[in-house]
Every structure is written in structure tokens, then in C-alpha cells.
């Protein structure tokens, strides 16, 4: 090869190698991320802090936001337009929450794990409720009180019914995410398309197979839940 061409190829190889190393370093940092959202205020930490479930069982936040819209027909009758609030989940006034807070109900946490923002339930889902001083008064949130309106069995049934629906696919989720204007970078979009949605579906159906004992029990109803049987089913 002419000397000039050989020199050009050498520099091109160096540039390509440098770009590959930068890309590898970026992916290594991204995929090693494990950072839960935390709060200095202990009450906020109780309501929205992580108890660890968002790492192994967390659902990508954009999927969480899209599910009650994409599968609204499985929400409780007459409450199809309420989203997660249809199950008694409590939402606070966004004006009273910190800047940059990702909208979600009390009792849910956020964790960036493997580069994807995930959300899952925490203790406050069962241990926070609201009280009105009068019928026309605004509800006041009290942490630590029983969540007397939450219907976790209906929530569980919704999640399972959604996972069994033929629209639980990357194409349908990504289309709904785009319609809602949710932020999703190209890498996470590719991850959801190739594996993320399928992984969430498989995990839901695996958990559902362990919760089949609930089919033989009376419906728990709002404010009641079989606390320890699901935990035993998951851990055994």
C-alpha cells in the first residue's frame, strides 16, 4: 500500500478503536448503575423510598405509566379513566412534591438499575391513607394508618390479565409510550423492544403461577390482603 494510504488506515483504526472503547466504557457505567431514589425527609422516604423490591421485581417506569391506559378495559368497572387510582392508590398534589419528581402514587419507589428507571411497591402502599375533616374537605394523607381503600387483589388481577393480553408486546407498549409523550432514550427503547417487555411479561406470569392459591380464597376486598402467603409463595 502507498505510505499515505497506510498512514490513513492506521489513524482510522485508532479512531475506531477509541470510539469502541468509549462506547464500551459508557455501557459498562450504564449497566453497572444501581441507584434508588431517596429523600432527606423521612416522611417522603416512607412514602416513596425504596425497600429493595424495585431491583428484582421493578417494572420499567414508562411501562408502568402506560399499562393502565393500554389495558384500561381490565380496570375496575366504572373506573377505567382513573388509572392506578382505580385500585385505591393515592396521588398527592404535584405542586407539593419536589421538583423533578416522577409522577406516581404513594407507596411506589424508583430505582435506576442497569440503566433503566424501574418502579415497584413499597410499605406505604398498605400503610398510608387519607382522612377528610368533613365531606367537602380535601383529603389529608396520614402515613402509618391502614390503607383502607387499597384493593391489592384487584391490582394483582389487573397485572395478570394485562400480561395475558395479546397487546402485551414491545410494539404496542412503545406506541403507547410515544402517544403519552414519555421520555425514552434510544438505548432503553431498543432494550424494551428486544427483551424488556418480554422479560416483564414472563416475570408477571411466573409470579401469577405462584399466586394461584388465591383463586381458591374469597376476594380480599379493599383494605384487606393476605400479607404473608404471597411472600411465602415468592420465597419458596
Can you name each region flagged by the protein language model?
Residues 2-21:
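N-terminal Sec-pathway targeting helices
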Residues 3, 26, 197-199:
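General helical secondary-structure elements
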Residues 10-16, 43, 62, 69, ...:
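Extended aliphatic helical segments
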Residues 25-115, 224, 229-235:
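Extracytoplasmic c-type cytochrome modules immediately beyond a signal peptide or single-pass transmembrane anchor
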Residues 84-236:
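Extracytoplasmic redox metalloprotein regions
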Amino acid at each position: 500500500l502507498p505510505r499515505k494510504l497506510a498512514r490513513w488506515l492506521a489513524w482510522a483504526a485508532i479512531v475506531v478503536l477509541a470510539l469502541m472503547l468509549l462506547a464500551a466504557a459508557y455501557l459498562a457505567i450504564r449497566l453497572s448503575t444501581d441507584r434508588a431514589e431517596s429523600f432527606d425527609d423521612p416522611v417522603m422516604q416512607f412514602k416513596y423510598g425504596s425497600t429493595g423490591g424495585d431491583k428484582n421485581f421493578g417494572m420499567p417506569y414508562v411501562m408502568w405509566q402506560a399499562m393502565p391506559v393500554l389495558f384500561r378495559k381490565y380496570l375496575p368497572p366504572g373506573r377505567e379513566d382513573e388509572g392506578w387510582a382505580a385500585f385505591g392508590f393515592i396521588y398527592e398534589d404535584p405542586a407539593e412534591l419536589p421538583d423533578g419528581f416522577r409522577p406516581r402514587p404513594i407507596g411506589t419507589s424508583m430505582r435506576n438499575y442497569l440503566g433503566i428507571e424501574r418502579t415497584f411497591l413499597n410499605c406505604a402502599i398498605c400503610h398510608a391513607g387519607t382522612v377528610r375533616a368533613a365531606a367537602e374537605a380535601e383529603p389529608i394523607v396520614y402515613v402509618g394508618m391502614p390503607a383502607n381503600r387499597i384493593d391489592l387483589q384487584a391490582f394483582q388481577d389487573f397485572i395478570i390479565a394485562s400480561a395475558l393480553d395479546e397487546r402485551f408486546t414491545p410494539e404496542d407498549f412503545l406506541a403507547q409510550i410515544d402517544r403519552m409523550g414519555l421520555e425514552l432514550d434510544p438505548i432503553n427503547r431498543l432494550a424494551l423492544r428486544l427483551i424488556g417487555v418480554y422479560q416483564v411479561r414472563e416475570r408477571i406470569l411466573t409470579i401469577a403461577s405462584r399466586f394461584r392459591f388465591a383463586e381458591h380464597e374469597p376476594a380480599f376486598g379493599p383494605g384487606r390482603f393476605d400479607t404473608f402467603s404471597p411472600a411465602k409463595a415468592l420465597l419458596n
